[in-house]
Amino acid sequence: MAKNHYNITLALAGICQSGRLVQQLSHENQCDTDAVTTMVNSILNTNPASVLDVFGNHERNLKIGLNAMLGMFNSSNNGISADLTRYILSLIALERRLMKNQAASDALGNRISLLERQQAYFEPMSEGMFNALAGIYVDVISPLGPRIQVTGSPDILRNPLVQAKVRAILLAGVRCAVLWQQVGGGRLQLMFSRQRLIQQAKDILSHC
C-alpha cells in the first residue's frame, strides 16, 4: 500500500510546530497563540475524523510547523536549527518509548480522556489547562526518559507558567509523533524521503 505523504507531512509538521513553539517560548517568552491553541486542541481531540481534523481541519494551523520542517531540512545543523532538530528527534524517541510501555500508554490515554471530559471547567488556554497538560507530561512522559533539555533564557525558563506551557507543547509533540507513526511515518524518511516531504510541505504552504 502506498504511503500517504500528505498525512505523513501534516503529522511531521505537528512535531516540528511543537519544537518551534518551545524554541520561541524559551528564548522570547512569547509565541503564536493560535499555533499553541492548535497544539493543545490536538491533544484533546481523541476521536478525529482525519489527520487534518487533529489540527482543526485547516492546513494554515500548521504553517509554523511546515516552515520549521523546511528549515530543518534545508539548513545546516547549527544554532537554532540544531536545537529544533534535537527537539524533534527527542519527541520521536519518546514516542517509541511510550509505545513500548503499555502501562504508560494506558495511563496517558486515561489522563487525556479525563481531561477531555473536564475541559468545560477550564478556560481555553488558561493557566489551569496548561498546568493540567504539564502534569500529564511530568507524570507519564518524563519518566520514560531521557528528558528533553530545553535551552533558552534562564530567566524565562524559571517562570512556572512558561514551564507549564513548554511541557504542554511537548506533550502535543509526542501526540503528533504517535500520529506520525500511525499514518506511516518513520525516521528513515527523514534521511531518504526528505525531498518528497519538502515538496509536499511546499505544496501545502502554497495554499495555506
UniProtKB/Swiss-Prot annotation:
Domain of life: Bacteria
GO cellular-component term (any): plasma membrane
Coiled-coil residues: none
Gene3D superfamilies: HflD-like
Swiss-Prot/TrEMBL keywords: Cell inner membrane, Cell membrane, Cytoplasm, Membrane
UniProt cross-references to Pfam families, sorted A to Z: DUF489
Membrane topology, as annotated: Peripheral membrane protein
Compartments (UniProt record): Cytoplasm; Cell inner membrane
UniProt-listed SUPFAM superfamilies: YcfC-like
Protein family according to the UniProt entry: Belongs to the HflD family.
Protein name, UniProt field: High frequency lysogenization protein HflD homolog
Gene (UniProt): hflD
